[in-house]
Amino acid sequence: LVLVGLEKYTYEEGETLCADVQIANYGKTDCAGDLEWTLWAYMPNEELDSVRKVAVKSGHMSAVSCPKGTLSKAGTLKIELNNKITAPVRCDLTVKIADAVNSYPIWIYKNEMPKCPESVYETTKLDLQAKKVLDNGGIVYYSPKSEESSFHNSIRAQFSTDFWSVGTFGRQEGAMGQLIQKDHPLFKEFPTESHTNWQ
């Protein structure tokens, strides 16, 4: 099994993805060879109204040795996330040695802060000004801070399987995910899937 120790799943253009690669070889024989990696981007194909998978970066680590019954360090990936990605994109980082292949989803976003239009009132609190703007038919962008005082009646979001759910173990958080309408215009420039993921 090829393991990549990613620090995170979301990156900005211009960052360098650095991650240690390990091989868990608990098979009957030693494993050796070149470790190959490819960063695949899911790029929109507007002519066909679909998405195509394109290799944007690739490389290898030579002569990796993985003795049986061990967890071996293969090396460290350093992938510069620049120049080929011009819009937010979902990618797969695929790593392979011999017959062992593994893939990790990552998302890359533009390194820019969007500007709020003057016609929109942006706030982190539902204050009197926000209510006044709404009462007058205006638009409010409400983005509360991610802290307990902003969400005092909410539960912490986390991934949880049905087996390890709050129904079985009552002291853990109860959220399991979301069902997302991924073709909604809201997500036009935000790559998403129909289910919760790490982005």
Per-region residue spans from a language model:
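Short, solvent-exposed loop/linker segments at the N-terminal edge
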Residues: 9-15
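Outer-membrane beta-barrel proteins
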Residues: 7-9, 25, 67, 81-83
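A glycine-rich, often tryptophan-bearing local segment used as a flexible ligand/cofactor-contacting loop or short
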Residues: 126-199
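Short, structured interface segments
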Residues: 92-112
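Beta-strand-rich binding/interaction modules
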Residues: 16-63, 72-80, 87-98
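Low-complexity, Pro/Ser/Thr- and charge-rich linker/hinge segments at domain boundaries
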Residues: 107-125
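Proline-enriched interdomain boundary motifs that mark the N-terminal boundary
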Residues: 2-5
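Hydrophobic beta-strand core residues of beta-sandwich domains
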Residues: 11, 66-71, 85, 134
